[in-house]
Amino acid sequence: MIKKVLISLFILLCHIPLVHAEDFMNEIARANDLYASNNYQQAADSYESLRDRGFNNGHMYYNLGNAYIRLGKTGPAILNYIRAKKLIPRDENLQVNLNFAIQQTRDKITQPPPDTLAILFFWVNDLSLNEHINLAFVVNLAFWLTLTAWFYFRTDFLRLTRNLIFFLLLLAFVAISVKLHFESNSKTGVVLAKTVSVKSGLDASNITLFELHEGALVNITDERQGWVEVQLDSKQKGWIPKDSLGI
């Protein structure tokens, strides 16, 4: 597993009130120091405290996953690696550690293969949603600046530039729409319980269809009365208690 603790400029990457900035920075430094000194449980507790207070950062989730994998808690480790992947999708070390963690699980269930839409828009997942929004903002600004210049200087170069940037702007908005579709329609859960029985209905007395173990990745298809319906493939589907799963 790749060993990497990010001593952070996390604060620059998150939108948090300035009045809390110093507190967050101190807590990050404390958590990183605890991890560096092999106090993994205390480090994990500090990172979890930051998350509970609204701190949302891919590098923090990555470090939290590393702390849990050191503690042998593969379920929480995989859960936080997946959270990190949504925010820092191009981090190669993150993908290596996620693959390593999955190999430590009993079920060894990998992430589902991309569907047709994901294959067609393969480049969309290379950026986080925030990055797509920021990119669209920059392209939109460039378009209006170019359009303004074209009104004053109607040259062929500015006309072609305007049309090209307009096309890129449309592409940026399409990318945001596709990314939102991916995030709203693909709900992945991670089993946190050591073992959980997948039932045929919303009650513990129902038939056990199969069992899952800590760290198993599942697709959540429904939620009712404290239970969630999970699916592995077209044949393996059933209900488990919601509190046995991390989302």
Segment roles from a protein language model:
Residues 107, 112-151:
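Membrane-embedded alpha-helical segments of integral membrane proteins
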Residues 74, 150-151, 156-193, 200-207, ...:
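Boundary regions of SH3-family modules and the immediately adjacent low-complexity/disordered segments
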Residues 207-223:
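Conserved beta-strand/loop element in small beta-rich adapter and peptidoglycan-binding domains
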